[in-house]
Amino acid sequence: MTQIFRIALLGLALALPLLASGVEPEADRWNLKDLYPSQPGWDKDAGTLEQELKDLSGCAGRLAQSPARFKRCLDLNAEVLKRFYRLYGYASQSRDEDTSLPSGQNLKQRADVLGTRLEEATSFLRPEILGLGRSKVNALLKANKSAAIYAHWLDDILRSASHTLDRRGEELIASFGAATSAAEAVYSTLADAEMPWPKVRLSDGTEVVVDQTAYEKYRALGNRSDRKIVFDAFWSKWREFERTFGVTLYEQLKKDAALAKIRRYPDSLAQALDANRLPQAVYDTLLTQAELHLPTLHRYFKLRARMLGLSEMRYYDIYPPMVSSNLKYPIGLSTELMLASVKPLGEDYVRAMAQGTKSGWMDVYPRPRKRSGAYMNGSAYDVHPYLLLNHNDDYESLTTLAHEWGHAMHSYLSIRSQPFINAEYPTFTAEIASTTNELLLLDHMLKIAQDDSERMIYLDSALENLRGTFFRQAMFAAFERDIHARVDKGESLTGEALTKIYGDILKRYHGDTQGVVKIDEIYTIEWAFIPHFYNRFYVFQYATSITAGAMFASEILNEKPLARERYLNILRAGGSRYPYELVKAAGVDLATAAPYQAIVARMNSIMDQIEVIQAKGK
């Protein structure tokens, strides 16, 4: 699968589970007819793609015959990619509407096959462009000014010369793409479909099957004994499959190490970062700063323990809210609040978002067999973004709405500003758009809060967001760096070994030996629960994104000159520039300590506000 397509669908593949129950009216469903009126339309377009792939093969060995032919071949490649993204979006979203229907599964499988054929058909492009060399490519661009839209795309290929194989080698890698995805497929099948989930009885007599959805719901119960029962049952079941999940993750790590070696990178991390020309200083600085500021995370845990009335904080005390809330946020109200919160981004932004919310872009409510989680798919260039939600009328659902619409507006602005080949953006900037909108929402909610009790709800949520998005993702990134480095060096890893490595990091981040949060050994299997580890070095970008988003949101809200325009220019730029340089040019250098120090200062400031409110009540 092409790099640009991986980027387009990462959010889809990595959606985190939310609650799934209830039924929604038809008006709250997305309109896939904007993609294709019916499956026959999809079938026809799939046939067109097959023919275009054959036509594209005619470009092999002939790219440089003339400037005009060079441009035509690049245009055909772009058209092939654009058509495939639309086909794949319809197939995957049809499957997600009801994951039990064979028709949806079949369509998704057909789209996967098309993806493999596309990989094979386009595999000649990179080695042939590299064979031309930079001077020849520049001459072709100069001779045909209309080809300038491909300048960045071509530069991204040319800079990878030392890491690209010859045509036959690239064809082999493309052909083996599907075969080497078995680790993730096995993991997903077991974790999502075949795990024999345990059943527990809660203190009120309720019997619960503790699957992933139930775990995420019941881990936040107010009754501490119930939380422990849920935790123990859930993680004990994962522990039973420690060896199996150890095999699947180790196979994934071996695949990543092999690809890095084949492409002549020193290690897996170097290859992952080079995909978007990210300096390793970004990764290293994030982890250094996260570890340096663990006392702030520990301060949060101590505050949480005090507010929950606990003499000892345990891992199953992480999730219950510090402040209870009965406030409801149905989708209509949530949409109004979201639209009000983004007013600092300007009238055009608000108007476009408002139109999208009532134009069939969203599938809003949970229902049986609908895919859990939330994602935005903005890969259908000629249509519009789509959002899958599982809205439960709570504050978390409101923040998820703001998050996913941040992604959607990023796609909307990018598509309006860039040609197709430059419209898709990397994860490094994608999550900035979503987290910035979350932070704007928080600011708005704090401003309209009726009293300190309501304000505490939002401050509590903000703290948990910082824990989960900055510190927790940095912790995952530390684990990834460790296990990849071991396999890159030729070490073998078992499930037991992975549990030990993860457990040590988990305990360090939570201050286990310092008595901050006690981590029971049974919970150190948590690594097996995280699907992100099958997409190498992805999660660190959540932490860098909330860091950058906090700075952008602060500057925009404080009406710093040009702050809004610099931020919107990141969204409009799409994938037309390398992301680190793009964000740096807007004023945030994520390879330096300052942005991370600012996000930690923000977390401390929120805790200060909570303690001031607490002091009032004494």
What are these regions (language model features)?
Residues 7-17:
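Bacterial N-terminal signal peptides
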Residues 21-324, 335, 506, 613-616:
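A well-structured
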Residues 23-24, 33-37, 41, 125, ...:
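C-terminal, non-catalytic "cap/extension" segments appended to globular domains
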Residues 264, 392-412, 434, 439, ...:
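Active-site recognition of the HExxH zinc-binding catalytic motif
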Residues 310-341, 410, 463-469, 474, ...:
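Long, K/E/R/D-enriched contiguous segments that form extended
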Residues 327-329, 382-401:
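Short pre-active-site segment immediately N-terminal to the catalytic Zn-binding motif
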Residues 327-329, 362-384:
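Catalytic zinc-binding patch centered on the HExxH motif and its immediate surroundings
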Residues 411-435:
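Post-HEXXH active-site segment of zinc metalloproteases
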